[in-house]
Amino acid sequence: MDANKMIINLAVLGKTQSGKSSAGNVLLGSADFYSRFAPGSVTKDCSLGRSCHIHGFMRRGGHEISLQIQVLDTPGYPHSKLSTRCVKQEVKKALEHHFGQEGLHLALLVHRADMPFFGQEASDSVQLIQELLGDSWKNYTAILFTHAEKIKEAGLSEEEYLCEASDALLTLLNSVQHRHIFLYERGNSWSEQRIKILERIMEFIKENHFQVLSFT
């Protein structure tokens, strides 16, 4: 293993049309995952993107460390064509296959900032994370808000948006120690935003002392 290289394993989970595949592409700086607007679910199978290599991303022990990001894209839950049982089995199998030995550093629960988070759909999202990650899910989950430009269009700051969030969303944020990230679809440089998001993800991982969630 290269001592000057670090591999970070991530998974994107969430509702259909929440922007999981698009978010995965931003993290990778590529187009590994097929993403388009559609009235129903687009992603039907899990797939691993690993095209992201950033040289000299950070320093450790006086040495520059290169970063490789691996992102597992997953079908939406609930899915417009697949049963809930099928989606759970597909994602669980993929987590075990891709991260069974190396482990998962962080799961990103993707949620559109311009959509409400409450009721049964909110419960389903949290339940999915709990079932897939087990009792330690709170330590390995962050919320990724997509379409964050809608917040500014509404005349709100990120802080004001969170203050006005539903009880269900606030409860979830409290559960994951307020680990959250905002992803802007417009008005920001993709490359700059990508680096900022990865730096924030690394902060979360450092807070976890680089521990991983194993699926063996």
UniProtKB/Swiss-Prot annotation:
Question: What is any Pfam family matched here?
Answer: AIG1
Q: Where is the AIG1-type G domain?
A: 5-216
Q: Does the keyword Repeat apply?
A: no
Which keywords does UniProt give here?
GTP-binding, Nucleotide-binding
InterPro entries recorded: G_AIG1, GIMA/IAN/Toc, P-loop_NTPase
Please give the Gene Ontology molecular function terms for this protein: GTP binding
The name under which this protein is listed is GTPase IMAP family member GIMD1
List the source organism: Rattus norvegicus (Rat)
Source organism, top-level taxon: Eukaryota
Q: Any signal peptide, and if so, which residues?
A: none
- Please name the taxonomic classification of the source: Eukaryota, Metazoa, Chordata, Craniata, Vertebrata
Residues involved in GTP binding:
14-22, 35, 147-149
Similarity comment: Belongs to the TRAFAC class TrmE-Era-EngA-EngB-Septin-like GTPase superfamily. AIG1/Toc34/Toc159-like paraseptin GTPase family. IAN subfamily.
